[in-house]
């Protein structure tokens, strides 16, 4: 009896996702370009020639927004289904956090969000893909910002060591997560936001797990939410993935 190969469901999902992305993205791009052309043509026409010009322009612009959102959702799903190969380097977790916060300085200032950062006094060496880790932190910080509707919006970011592992904790003073929804927040496509894709937190957890880490959530309705990402130290990472890495690695962001 011939041996049967065990199928990898993640690989299958990745193959399906790639096929769907190709089939959907091309007509989606055409729709976006046509909506752009329609908007430009309408804008150039005299108002007297098109009595409903304002309404038609609004429809064209709405189409642009919808197609752009669909394209972003498609990109997010493809990233989840077929995670990119990690480019591991030696980083300081403090520096990754600092650079991510600097990237959001203007956004938070515009939204009236106060950020308080308390970083561990010494470097926290981790083996990581710096870009992916920053993406995960960026998603968590933007989630925290969107969860706050109070007059005084505050995000506290802390790094440290607990249970022998470096961590980063992002705490907001927002609405908190209802008890009934807490089991679902990492479920693909689950969202309670009007324009949410339901991809942000699943991608965060996927990235954290790719790094041998974990993510924990503590939340209280009306008070806020704390998301804690714990990662292995450099030597812990090597022990978890023996033979996967060379002894010498590039330094991607150590102080």
Question: Model-found features: residue ranges?
Answer:
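Histidine phosphotransfer helical core of two-component systems
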Residues: 28-68, 88
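Conserved HAMP-HisKA connector
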Residues: 2-23
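Detector for a conserved hydrophobic position within an alpha-helical segment of the HATPase_c
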Residues: 208-209
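Short helix N-cap motif at coil->helix boundaries in the Bergerat
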Residues: 93, 176-184
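Short beta-strand/loop element within the Bergerat-fold HATPase_c
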Residues: 154-164
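A conserved beta-strand-to-alpha-helix junction within the catalytic ATP-binding
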Residues: 89-101
């Amino acid at each position: 009896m011939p041996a049967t190969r065990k199928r990898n469901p993640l690989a299958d999902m990745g193959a399906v996702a790639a096929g769907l992305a190709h089939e959907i993205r091309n007509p989606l791009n055409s729709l976006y370009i046509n909506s752009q052309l329609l908007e430009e043509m309408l804008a150039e026409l005299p108002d007297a020639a098109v009595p409903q010009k304002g309404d038609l322009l609004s429809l064209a612009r709405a189409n642009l927004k919808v197609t752009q959102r669909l394209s972003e959702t498609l990109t997010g799903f493809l990233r989840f289904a077929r995670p990119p190969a990690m480019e591991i380097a030696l980083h300081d977790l403090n520096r990754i956090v600092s650079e991510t916060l600097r990237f959001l300085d203007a956004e938070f200032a515009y939204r009236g969000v106060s950020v308080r950062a308390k970083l561990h006094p010494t470097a926290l060496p981790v083996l990581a893909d710096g870009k992916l880790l920053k993406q995960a932190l960026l998603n968590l910080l933007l989630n925290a910002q969107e969860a706050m509707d109070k007059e005084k919006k505050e995000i506290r970011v802390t790094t440290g060591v607990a249970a022998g592992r470096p961590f980063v904790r992002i705490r907001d003073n927002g609405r908190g997560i209802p008890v009934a929804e807490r089991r679902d927040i990492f479920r693909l496509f689950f969202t309670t936001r009007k324009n949410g894709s339901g991809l942000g937190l699943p991608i965060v957890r996927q990235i954290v797990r790719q790094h041998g880490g974990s993510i924990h959530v503590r939340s209280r309705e009306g008070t806020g939410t704390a998301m804690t990402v714990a990662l292995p130290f450099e030597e812990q990472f090597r022990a978890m993935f023996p033979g996967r890495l060379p002894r010498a690695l590039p330094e991607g962001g150590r102080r």
